[in-house]
A protein has these predicted regions:
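N-terminal intrinsically disordered, cationic/polar leader segments
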Residues: 1-32, 41, 45-104
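Gly/Ser/Thr-rich active-site loops/lids in small-molecule metabolic enzymes
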Residues: 36-37
Length: 104
C-alpha cells in the first residue's frame, strides 16, 4: 500500500511524504502506481518550472516533498496533488491511503 502523509503549518502544506508500493498489479502493469507517479511528477515539475527554489524533493524509497517558498501558485499545485491522490484513494482503498493535516 502507498501511504501519503502531509504536514500542515499555518494552514499551508509544508511537507508531503509518499511511501510504499500500491501492489495493485505486477510491475509495468500497475495503473495505481502509474497514476500516483504521474500526479507527483507533474506536480514536482510544475513547481520547479514556476520557481526552482520553491520546493525540495528527495526520491529514495519514496518521495518527500518539502515546500521551501510558499506562493499562491505553489500552494495551489501542492493542494491539487493531495486532492488528486485523495480522489484516487477513493477508488483504490486497498492500494493508497491518505493521512494528513498533521501539524509540523
Amino acid at each position: 500500500m502507498v501511504k501519503v502523509n502531509y504536514f500542515v503549518k499555518e494552514n499551508k502544506i509544508e511537507r508531503v511524504e509518499i511511501l510504499g508500493h500500491s501492489e495493485f498489479a505486477d510491475y509495468g502493469q500497475d495503473i495505481v502506481c502509474a497514476s500516483i507517479s504521474s500526479i507527483v511528477i507533474t506536480t514536482v515539475n510544475a513547481c520547479l518550472k514556476l520557481d526552482e527554489k520553491s520546493i525540495k524533493h528527495v526520491q529514495n524509497e519514496g518521495v518527500i516533498i518539502t515546500v521551501l517558498k510558499h506562493s499562491k501558485e505553489i500552494d495551489t499545485l501542492i493542494n491539487n496533488m493531495i486532492d488528486l491522490l485523495t480522489e484516487l484513494s477513493k477508488d483504490y482503498k486497498e492500494n493508497i491511503k491518505i493521512g494528513g493535516g498533521n501539524c509540523v
